[in-house]
Structures are given as C-alpha cells and as structure tokens.
C-alpha cells in the first residue's frame, strides 16, 4: 500500500517534466492529457485557415490582404493550380507552420470545354453542322478561309443533305472542301466546309482570348459522311493561358515569392 502511494507520488512529480532536447518536450503520463487554452483567449495565436478562391481577382485581393514576409506562391501547370502559403518559411533558419493557405484552380470556360469534349469525336453531317451552328460565336474574325457568316451558310446547307448519299470530296484552292452528294428528290449537289477553322476562345473562365486552329476531317463509307475536327496543340494554348495568369499575379501582388511547383 505504502509502496503504491510512493509510486503514485513519483509519477505525479515526473508528469509534465521538461526533457533536455532541441524540440520542446515534456514527459506526460498516459493518465493525463495536454489541453490548449487558446480557444479561451481573445484571439488565436496564429491564423489556421485554408480557402479556395473562385477567380483571379479574388485571389489577388486575398493575397494582398494577408501576405506577410515569406509568403510563397506555388504554380502547378500539370494541375492548373495555384497554391499560396502565407506563413511559409522565411529561410532555412526561420521555419514556420504553414497553416494559412489559399488555393485557386484555373477553371475552363464553357466554350473551351465544349470544343474539347467534341475534339476528335466522329459525327454525321447533321450533328457536325448543328455543333458548328451552336458554336459559331467562337469563330475568329481573322485567320479563316471563310467568314463566320459564310461558315454558318455552309452549315445550314448541310441540313438539306440529311437523306443524301455522299460520293466524293474535292479540295479547293480557296481552302475549302467540296462534298458531292446525290439525292433522289433534288438529284444531288455540292456542300462546302473549310479545311481548317480558327477559333477565338477563352481557355479559362473570364480569361484572355486565344486563337487555336482546328482541322476538319472526314470519312465517306457506303455513301455516309462522317465529320470531326482535331484541335491543333490545345496543350500549348492552355500553357500560354496559365503562364499569362501567373504573370498577372506577379504584376498585381508585390513582395511575395513565386515558385513553379506542387505541394506534396
């Protein structure tokens, strides 16, 4: 009994005893737990917050409001992500917790997603024509063999070939292709499409406009026409748009460190 009491007293005396280490450490019995009283203070010791911003402007405003010495911005092209750590390490001798963070993922625009989703996807002439008609606003004013109005007229002409049998395709010197078809009622005719289309489009929502070319492809089998398009180097357009976003941040956010990299 006495020995048990002595052991309990010794345990009580040892509990909470500081140890001689580089990292502040205390010896704590399993029968005890350490409780922080920070929640009862007037304000927290440091900011512990993670937010996701939904626009470039919101990100710029937030970083400018909370940035401190050592704040770091990490840009990840692969994920189209921008991560900010406000209480990042000032240098090797001044580590910090990194508890206050902000993230922004560059969102694709509705138009870009529409063209990307249909990229290299085979369609019949009616489906292809309807897609172009619904997205005629994306046709660039410059750089095309035909104007947007001319392309729309070509697209509408394809609607008349619903029951036609396609025979051949001829490439013309003006940069268009002529599709010859036969029809029981009209006897047949020709419809045209450009070999290549130049788009003027925003890769990111509310971002800058970029031009990207799309090659028009076709296949005729048993009188049926299949059409599709192939975007030319879309990844380069995305990379350029992402780099432009980073440059905007550098222009509008001073005295922070920028790094190309991902948080792991």
How would you name each of these model-derived features?
Residues 5-10, 59-63, 128, 132, ...:
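Generic structural signal of hydrophobic/aromatic residues within well-ordered alpha-helices
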Residues 43-48, 112-118, 137-138, 231:
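Charged, low-complexity surface segments at secondary-structure and domain boundaries
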